[in-house]
Design a protein with these regions (language model features):
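Acidic/His- and Gly-rich active-site-bordering loop/insert found
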Residues: 2-108, 129-134
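Fold-independent oxyanion-binding glycine-rich loops
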Residues: 60, 78-80, 102, 110, ...
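Midchain, well-structured core segments that form catalytic/ion-binding scaffolds
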Residues: 155-247
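Glycine/serine-rich anion-binding loops at beta->alpha junctions
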Residues: 103-119, 198
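Acidic/histidine-rich catalytic neighborhood of metal-dependent amide-processing enzymes
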Residues: 113-183, 187
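Short glycine/serine- and small hydrophobic-enriched flexible loop segments
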Residues: 25, 122-129, 214-220
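Structural motif
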Residues: 72-75, 103-104, 139, 166-169, ...
Length: 247
């Protein structure tokens, strides 16, 4: 079969049952942020079974598997941690069963993002089997703690020199769309300082909540203004308050 797309398609069809089994077994393992050890072990075993050229776990706990040895370094990334399931009784299907119905796999992580990892592991394997890795090394990275500490996993990989790819493909769910960019992201903490006083004599103190109130209103107005000036490629920026706390 000379057409590379046809070769990949045929191999994908052949490996579909294995991909489904692999994904269902990952879904069956609870893997919230900072609790990924068991699911990392399962993914590592799959890479080993498929004969990846190199498989390792870095100091943070990220799993990295390589196929090919060319000079061009391509990373295909997916975070292997998930958010929690909340109240399991509110689910219409068992979040840890990986139920298959009408060609769809249901469960925590099926879409975000263990499905992407299953596709990446087998995609790299298929690319090698189809003879498409001439001059290329592909690293599949199953990264940890993305849900709680977005960016920490790749910050570690780059700062510690674990891997320095030329190209990165991210397997976040996009309904199979190809996205060529993403808005930047920042986390900021704003503090206001008060002075305590008895509730019957508030004039003797400084209320830090009152000092925060206009800041909250300003942030809400900023989000409205950002929506009025969308970028032609990336769309509108957003800003949101996600947490307020008093020590």
């Amino acid at each position: 079969m000379s057409d590379p797309i046809a070769r990949v398609g045929a191999l994908a069809d052949r490996y579909t049952p294995d991909v489904v089994t692999f994904l269902r077994e990952m879904i069956a393992i609870p893997s919230e942020s900072a609790g990924e050890r068991e699911v990392i072990a399962r993914a590592r075993a799959e890479m080993g079974r498929l004969g990846f050229d190199e498989v390792k776990v870095d100091g943070l706990g990220n799993l990295l598997g390589r196929v090919g040895s060319g000079p061009l370094v391509v990373a295909i990334d997916g975070h292997i941690d998930t958010v929690g399931v909340g109240d399991p009784s509110t689910w219409t299907r068992d979040p840890y069963r990986g139920e298959v119905a009408d060609g769809v796999i249901y469960g925590r992580g099926a879409s975000d993002q263990e499905g992407g990892i299953a596709a990446a592991v087998y995609g790299a394997h298929i690319a090698r089997e189809a003879g498409l890795l001439d001059g290329v090394q592909v690293w599949v990275t199953a990264t940890v703690m993305e849900e709680d500490c977005d960016g920490l996993c790749w910050q570690y990989i780059l700062r510690e020199g674990v891997l320095k790819p030329d190209v990165v493909v991210i397997t976040e769910p996009t309904n199979l769309g190809v996205y060529r960019g993403h808005r930047g992201r920042m986390e900021m903490e704003v503090r206001t300082q008060g002075r305590s006083a008895h509730g019957s004599m508030p004039e003797r103190g400084v209320n830090a909540v009152y000092k925060m109130a206009p800041i909250v209103a300003d942030i809400e107005r900023l989000n409205q203004r950002l929506g009025e000036r969308p970028d032609a490629f990336l769309g509108a920026g957003t800003v949101a308050i996600s947490q307020i706390r008093s020590p």
